[in-house]
A protein has these predicted regions:
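Phosphate-bearing ligand-interacting subdomains
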Residues: 17-26, 126-220
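HTH-adjacent hinge/linker in prokaryotic transcriptional regulators
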Residues: 28, 32-83
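Hydrophobic/small residue at the entry helix of a nucleotide-binding pocket
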Residues: 91
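Extreme N-terminal segment that seeds HTH/winged-HTH DNA-binding domains in transcriptional regulators
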Residues: 1-27
């Protein structure tokens, strides 16, 4: 199966569908059931899954195991992905200890920091290495993805080091945008911005719109 180019909003919903499918108790699932668990409507589910070439069977629904395989292949989750965390402050500590990564096909295998008092610690079962060893450890452990949780001032230098070491995907939690070459995927996660967006949807909810209605009205 080739990797299809999907709308960004559809990509964002696929992991939610996976979560609902993981909780399914039968071998098939209807678009209505999948929609209820994902917080969207059934028409949206059918549209999203049609992008994968999956149309279900009228009166039966979707084969759960097959749909899980389709979504995992589209997301590149057919095997465990090795992850590194750069910056072991409060957020880095929390992410290193988060147990939900493993259940979704991600394994944190490396952690890095510049603080001598943090280097050498075990966090979430992973040894914190000095930043100077980043390239060596990344290559040795086959890391493909990185979580960037450094201060803003050092985020770009850390991203540059990750790219040079061969990391091809970066999830940036630092409060500063980082640049990377076209062959490297970067997603920026600014928690302050997320709170601002949440405030907007809070106003919509207070006005009587559901979260889905608010998103739909915004053109997603």
């Amino acid at each position: 199966m080739s990797i299809r180019r999907l709308p960004e909003a559809t990509v964002a919903r696929l992991p939610v569908y996976l979560r609902v499918l993981a909780e399914a108790t039968e071998g098939t699932i209807s678009s209505e059931h999948l929609a209820a668990g994902a917080g969207v409507n059934a028409a949206q589910v059918r549209k999203d899954l049609s992008h994968l070439g999956s149309y279900g069977t009228r009166g039966v629904g979707y084969d759960v195991a097959y749909l899980v395989r389709q979504i995992n292949r589209q997301l590149g989750l057919t095997a465990d992905r090795r992850v590194a965390i750069v910056g072991i402050g409060n957020l880095g500590h929390a992410l290193a200890r988060y147990g939900g990564f493993a259940t979704r096909g991600f394994r944190v295998v490396a952690a890095f920091d510049v603080d001598p008092s943090t280097v050498g610690q075990q966090v979430g079962g992973v040894l914190v290495e000095p930043f100077e060893r980043l390239a060596e450890v990344i290559e040795g452990k086959g890391v493909e993805l990185a979580l960037l949780t450094t201060p803003a001032a050092s985020a770009q230098a850390a991203a540059d080091a990750l790219v040079a070491a061969g990391v091809n995907s970066i999830l940036n939690f630092a409060p500063a945008r980082v640049a990377a070459p076209p062959h490297v995927a970067v997603r920026q996660v600014d928690l302050g911005v997320e709170l601002q967006i949440l405030c907007y949807y809070g106003l919509q909810a207070a006005a009587g719109l559901t979260a889905y209605d608010a998103v739909d009205a915004a053109g997603s």
